[in-house]
C-alpha cells in the first residue's frame, strides 16, 4: 500500500511540474522583456509557445519584440496569431491598426477601427488618435 502511495505521489509531482514550468517560461520571459533583454525573452516566449501554443500573450510579446527589431513580417504574423486566439485583444488590434496606417492601407484601418471600437475597454482613448492620423494621411493624399 505504501509503495502504491509513493508511486501515486511521484506521478502527481511529474504531472504538476510541466504545468508549473510552462507558466514560468512566460513569467520569466515577460520579466526579461521588461528589463529590455529582448533576445533572451524572445527565446523564452517561443519556448512557451511550444508548450502552450494557445497562449495569446506570448504571441503578443513576440510581436512587440519583432516591432522593436523592425521585422514587420514576423510582427504581423504574431499579431495575427494573437488576434486569432484572442479576437478581443486591444493591444494586438491597436498594433495591427498602427501597422496598417504606416502601410497606408486605409480600408483595412477603417475596418479594424470599427472592430476596435467594439472591443476597447482600456485603450479607447486611442480611437480619436487613429481617426486623426487617418484623416491627416487622407488629406495629404488629396493635396
Question: Where do the PLM segments sit?
Answer:
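Alpha-helical segment of the N-proximal tetratricopeptide repeat
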Residues: 23-47, 51
Amino acid at each position: 500500500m505504501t509503495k502504491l502511495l509513493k508511486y501515486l505521489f511521484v506521478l502527481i509531482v511529474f504531472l504538476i511540474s510541466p504545468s508549473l514550468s510552462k507558466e514560468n517560461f512566460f513569467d520569466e520571459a515577460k520579466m526579461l522583456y521588461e528589463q529590455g533583454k529582448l533576445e533572451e525573452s524572445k527565446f523564452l516566449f517561443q519556448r512557451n509557445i511550444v508548450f502552450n501554443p494557445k497562449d495569446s500573450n506570448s504571441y503578443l510579446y513576440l510581436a512587440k519584440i519583432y516591432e522593436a527589431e523592425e521585422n514587420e513580417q514576423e510582427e504581423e504574423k504574431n499579431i495575427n496569431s494573437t488576434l486569432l486566439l484572442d479576437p478581443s485583444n486591444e493591444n494586438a488590434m491597436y498594433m495591427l491598426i498602427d501597422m496598417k496606417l504606416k502601410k497606408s492601407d486605409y480600408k483595412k484601418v477603417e475596418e479594424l477601427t470599427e472592430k476596435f471600437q467594439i472591443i476597447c475597454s482600456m485603450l479607447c482613448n486611442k480611437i480619436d488618435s487613429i481617426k486623426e492620423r487617418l484623416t491627416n494621411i487622407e488629406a495629404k493624399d488629396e493635396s
